[in-house]
Amino acid sequence: MKKILIVMSAAAGLAFVGCRPQNPDAPAVREFIRDNWHTTVQHCTADTATLIGLPYPYTVPTAGAMFREMYYWDTFFTNEGLVRDGHPELAKGNTDNLLYMVRRFGKVYNGSRTYYEARSQTPYLSMMVDRIYRLTGDKQWLADAYQTLKEEYGFWMRERLTPTGLNRYGSSASDALVDEFLVTGGKRLG
């Protein structure tokens, strides 16, 4: 891979030096994230309008009123940060909520809103399950999660399989679901 990057960089007239760019604000940003996880936690157990109730507290993409729902692949990256910063219980709750969605709907929606029903995102749930199992060592939890992961896999093989035999994420939204999404999106934009 390094050879490929060197050749591509040379072809583009760039010098490959094998280092990561340093942002002078990075430590402050990192500290802000670490100190503010608690501001991204929501807990809504009952379905309310378009919001899907989830059994465990969960994290949303940002603090404030803009988001009350969790998002599938955002949660993978969030969980990595939560574990790194000493919040494995929140990462497990996030993962348990996604497993709950599979048990309830047969798949994980793009986000925990009804208008995301027809949209899928990259399936990171098995990696989240692996991460939580490695933290907890809970074999019964893993066995239960494995059964649920098989159900999610079935969705990908039925609904998101291409003629090449590969899977892809996408949308099969009806006009009604698109309209529902536009109403909420419009409210967010003011």
Q: Which role fits each region the language model picked out?
A:
Residues C19-G190:
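Acidic, mature catalytic/reactive cores of soluble proteins
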Residues M1-Q22:
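Bacterial Sec-dependent N-terminal signal peptides
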